[in-house]
Amino acid sequence: MQTLPAASAVLLKAQPGAAPQILITERSPHMRFAGGAYVFPGGRVDAADLATARNPVLAQGFAGLDDADAAARVAAIRETFEETGLLLTRGPAAGPAPLANSRNLLAKGPDSAEACTFAALIAGLGHRVDAQVLHPFAQWQPAENAEVTRRYLTHFYLIDVTDQPLAPLSPDGQEAVSLQWITAAALLENHLDALVFPTRCLLARIAQYPDIAALLAAAARHGSVMVQPLITNRGGEPWVTIPEGLDYPQVEAPLASLRCT
């Protein structure tokens, strides 16, 4: 089975005297992959995302980034806009009507044209994708022997939106059916069964830190290391393990206790 590139944005909003909140989306139960799961905004990387990243009219701060990272950063910004209505590009303020029209155009077109449409839309707004807004956090792909319907290698990026003007957000109604701002600890406590294994591990990693500054510093120290779990047999029971030393507080669990798709 082919491994496809994907990208996700972990949007963070500071709270005075409390842990930061994360924007989480609930996927439509009708989706083939992770239907009904709580996930970060994101989706598949398209070839046109790389073209956007390498176009100085449409992007800034991408010099020195490899192609996979560059394309994934654009895809993370694009998918966040599609699924939530939050446009995290640099440029003149855009009113609600132009943004709504842009989002509708993305929704109406075929999936294969979304990245090209997004490039045209930000060009029309006079906007650019700023690579430095995204902080590399992790890369994940399924275990070699995992029983999954699709295989993705997903880049995860942290984005601090505390100082962003956040207009009312709304799910696209196709991939995402609900949105909420919630802490990592609350997600793990209240929605554990709705979290696929990578999301669960990433939230546990985030929950270790009291604020966004500490989280970003830890992410910079550890880098965006690729994690591929191992599924092994222990006494007739399959267990999932990930490497130690990568800032994840839990590195193993029985497969039967996890949601994998």
Task: Give residue spans per PLM region.
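N-terminal leader/linker segments that precede catalytic domains of diphosphate-processing enzymes
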Residues: M1-T261
